[in-house]
Amino acid sequence: MLERLHSVPPTAPAAAELGRRLARTHLAGAAAYGVGPEGWEGDGFFGPLSAPLPMVLGEWASWGAFYAEARVTPLARMARDAGVYDAAETTRFDRIAARLATGELDTGEPVARLHGDLWSGNVMWTEGGAVLVDPAAHGGHHETDLALLALFGTPHLAHVLDGYKEVHPLADGWRERQGVHQLHCLLVHAVVYGGGYAQQAMEVTRRWVRPGAH
């Protein structure tokens, strides 16, 4: 029998505790970048329950290679095939994937155990604290979960981050890398909804693709 949870308004102390618990979850680790939960076979799913998109799972030795090959490139191709981007625009995602694959944006930290779809709608605030729902769990970079919390406006986000950093300090430059860590989610939304999400994803490439890069 499942326990019924009742929502309450979020508070700063609850947000800080969410940050601490999330950091501990990340520190529990995973066997490799891109690996699914223990016992899971095949790929996963990401996006709205009404039309989930495939989420590639596997094993990668570095975060940059994993994120380029299993997240950015497949979704950019999907967006192109859906008519969201033309060939020239898709090339910009290829360039950012190439930069990721070099390991330039890796931070040298251990693989984190991610929720994987940690936007604000998947945080339920209850009397017992925050409860995370609807995971797309896999091994990844801890900054990805934090970037998704920021993407759609999580309540008391500053307190979440403060609590997180009590347990796990963040590497220099983490704020600048947020857009890259949001890119997969933005591309999913671009495929499903188009519109402003497609533009937001393109803005990330303008920040991270060097002028004249091929």
How would you label these PLM feature ranges?
Residues 26-30, 165-168, 191:
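Protein kinase-like catalytic domain
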Residues 1-65:
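ATP-binding pocket architecture of kinase catalytic cores
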Residues 15-18, 89-93, 201:
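Hydrophobic packing residues in well-ordered alpha-helices of helical domains and bundles
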Residues 179-187:
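Hydrophobic alpha-helical segments that form the core
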Residues 63-65, 77, 107-113, 120-176, ...:
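Active-site Asp-x-Gly
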Residues 43-101:
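Active-site catalytic-loop/activation-segment of kinase and kinase-like phosphoryl-transfer enzymes
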Residues 189-214:
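ATP/Mg2+ or Mg2+-diphosphate-binding catalytic cores
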